[in-house]
Amino acid sequence: TKTQTLQEPVNTPDGIPNENGNTPAKENSQALARLLKVQVSLDGIAGHELRGHSGSSCLQVDINLQTSPQEPHPRVAVVISSDSGKIIGSGYCDEGAIGANDDTGHALIRYTLDQLPLNKGRYRIGVYLLCSKGRYVYEWTDPLAHIELKNDGQHQGPWILGGNWASYP
């Protein structure tokens, strides 16, 4: 599991990750938002190695984080990658959606993806804590968990495409 908290500025002219995967940190990044606890569940079972079924399993990611009054509300992304690390998809919370639940700046949020549209296979689940515009990464954990999905169908590729088939004259 790779966990990274940016504490030293990384100088790149455009804010894009450099060859080490780092993005520039803002000044005093220790006082900014941070992940406190993240839990991944598949079909109501929490863990780091989870098993489910394509098209019917429900993925939930519960995130407890620390916000900062000096910084605009952060954003969180849940990233699904292949077992080799290739990003397949991501879900970002809306800008301004995270606010502190109490005086200490703690916030609790949940990401839910019902009826997982992923085909059979093994996938990584990662969580990224970003600045309010989604440009800078404060902290990430990837992989946080792995999910293994089974499917009895003949589908090809990582996604099971929805849609309807109909015959017509």
Question: How should each PLM-predicted stretch be described?
Answer:
Residues 1-169:
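Localized sequence-composition bias
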